[in-house]
């Protein structure tokens, strides 16, 4: 297993960690023409309850 030769400074550690960013979720429009709400891809629409043209669950 690799072991660091020297202690990494606080500035270098923080500079390296500053690159770890959370990306914003990708949103798509609901395929239901009456709804068109933004939703996550490959997930049933939370407002109308449809997925791939089928009614999966009751609308919220």
Curated annotation (Swiss-Prot):
Annotated GO MF terms: structural constituent of ribosome
Superkingdom, natural source: Bacteria
Residue numbers spanned by region Disordered: 1-20
Residues annotated as transmembrane: none
GO biological process: translation
Segments forming a coiled coil: none
Keywords: Ribonucleoprotein, Ribosomal protein
Record flagged with keyword Ribosomal protein: yes
Biased composition (Basic residues): 1-19
Matches recorded under SUPFAM superfamilies: Zn-binding ribosomal proteins
A Pfam family the protein falls into: Ribosomal_L32p
Gene Ontology cellular component terms for the protein in this record: large ribosomal subunit
Entry-linked PANTHER family: 50S RIBOSOMAL PROTEIN L32 (PTHR35534), LARGE RIBOSOMAL SUBUNIT PROTEIN BL32 (PTHR35534:SF1)
UniProt family annotation: Belongs to the bacterial ribosomal protein bL32 family.
Name used for this protein in its record: Large ribosomal subunit protein bL32B
Lineage, top ranks: Bacteria, Bacillati, Actinomycetota, Actinomycetes, Pseudonocardiales
């Amino acid at each position: 297993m690799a072991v660091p030769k020297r202690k990494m400074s606080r500035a270098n550690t923080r500079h390296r960690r500053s690159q770890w960013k959370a990306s914003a979720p990708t949103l798509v429009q609901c395929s239901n023409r009456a709804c068109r709400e933004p939703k996550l891809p490959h997930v049933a629409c939370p407002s109308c309850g449809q997925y791939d043209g089928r009614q999966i669950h009751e609308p919220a």
